[in-house]
Amino acid sequence: MTQSNPNEQNVELNRTSLYWGLLLIFVLAVLFSNYSFN
C-alpha cells in the first residue's frame, strides 16, 4: 500500500512514451529524407 509504485509506473510510462516519440520522429525523418532525395 505504498505510494512509490504508482510513481515508478508513471516514470516508466513517461520513458516509454518518450522512446516511442523519438522513434516516430526518426521514422518520419527517414521517410522525409527518402521523399526529398527522390
UniProtKB/Swiss-Prot annotation:
Indicate how the chain sits in the lipid bilayer. Answer: Single-pass membrane protein
Give one Pfam family.
Answer: PsbL
Q: Which family does the record claim for this protein?
A: Belongs to the PsbL family.
Q: Does the keyword Lyase belong to this entry?
A: no
**Subcellular location(s) of the protein:** Plastid, Chloroplast thylakoid membrane
Q: What is this protein called?
A: Photosystem II reaction center protein L
Instruction: Give an example GO biological process.
Output: photosynthesis
Which stretches are transmembrane? 17-37
